Amino acid sequence: MKLLHVDGSILGPHSVSRTVSAAIVDRLRAQHPGLDVIYRDLAGTPLPHLSGAVLAGAQPNATNTPDVQHDVELGRQVLEEFLAAEIVVIGAPLYNFTLSSQLKAWIDRILVAGVTFRYGPSGAEGLAGGKRVIAVVSRGGLYGPGTPAAAAEHAETYLRTVLAFIGITAPEVIVAEGIALGPEARERALAGALDAAAALKAA
């Protein structure tokens, strides 16, 4: 069984989403001793943002400069990692009301027409269903349903939309919020998220 672990936080060891996503992977490793884990630290090794040159360079028979060809091949590798994974664990902090740009760059490499989705007479159809996706969303403030800032939350809502678009309609989402509201609030949020991670089903 293959697991892809993706972290989008820029905060390293101070990151709540990284702490919780790592705990999830550790739990799944313990439950599945033969688990094959691929890890992408999108802050430590950022992916280049998608460009017109790369889109053109990915077309059949394209003639590319070495830099563009490297970027095209990197995009293919990222896509293949995602397609091969049966489980995907995503650490997704909320930065300025949305995902980190590093995580968005990864998403742009896995949303590929004809591979993870396609357009037909009835609109878009997801082609990447069947995966188990577990996302950890960390938020400094309070953005949950019913809060004054709920409409400004574009990390969890965006992730759910993107995943549904490619056929993953039931992701498991763990939220840690209020982590910037003081040390006690941070500890409560982290503890609650770790408890939720420990309660995840084995498979």
From Swiss-Prot:
Family, per entry: Belongs to the azoreductase type 1 family.
Organism: Methylorubrum extorquens (strain PA1)
Gene3D superfamilies noted in UniProt: 3.40.50.360
Entry binding sites for FMN: S9, S15, V16, S17, S138, R139, G140, G141
Cofactor note: Binds 1 FMN per subunit.
Cofactor: FMN
MF annotations from Gene Ontology: electron transfer activity; FMN binding; oxidoreductase activity, acting on NAD(P)H as acceptor; oxidoreductase activity, acting on NAD(P)H, quinone or similar compound as acceptor
Gene name of the encoded protein: azoR
The enzyme's E.C. designation: 1.6.5.-, 1.7.1.17
Classification via Pfam families: Flavodoxin_2 (PF02525)
This protein's UniProt keywords: Flavoprotein, FMN, NAD, Oxidoreductase
Name of the molecule in the record: FMN-dependent NADH:quinone oxidoreductase
InterPro entries: Flavodoxin_fold, Flavoprotein-like_sf, FMN-dep_NADH:Q_OxRdtase_AzoR1, NADH:quinone_OxRdtase_FMN_depd
Chain ranges passing through the membrane: none
Subunit architecture: Homodimer.
Function: Quinone reductase that provides resistance to thiol-specific stress caused by electrophilic quinones. Also exhibits azoreductase activity. Catalyzes the reductive cleavage of the azo bond in aromatic azo compounds to the corresponding amines.
Cystine residue pairs: none
Domain of life according to the entry: Bacteria
Catalytic activity: 2 a quinone + NADH + H(+) = 2 a 1,4-benzosemiquinone + NAD(+); N,N-dimethyl-1,4-phenylenediamine + anthranilate + 2 NAD(+) = 2-(4-dimethylaminophenyl)diazenylbenzoate + 2 NADH + 2 H(+)
Name of the top EC class for this enzyme: oxidoreductase
